């Protein structure tokens, strides 16, 4: 098991002694590079992504698990393809067979409602999920809701970025011992 996190502010390598935590940086490209590197160098059976996310649903808060992943900034609409769908691919949703929330990943910090509506918005999960799916590696994604993806999102994120750490540590210990 390897845990991928964008920023040290979210989780440090020392926070879960004995578990491998890798920092990947922000965005889909950085996530794809680090995920590929981790798979190539360690051949994990499970990759877990932890980080912060904005919620598009005011009723969603705290630590949540996402299991359905979309690329919210894929826009080939001039070709007659819906936003979020990658041209010439069979499926635009990545799912890992567990109940959970939907997460729209894109290379932008969301401060208003995006065209593709999902429960959560982040900047890395779709890339990790897609690479795990392509390599038959199990994937779990836990996000701490740091903001409501609105006009206050950037300030809320700054205030809340480190708050989910203890909840995530408890969840990992509960699930994996």
Give each language-model segment a name.
Residues 1-2:
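Extreme N-terminal starter segment of soluble prokaryotic enzymes
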Residues 9-177:
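Glycine-rich phosphate- or other oxyanion-binding loops that anchor nucleotides, phosphorylated ligands
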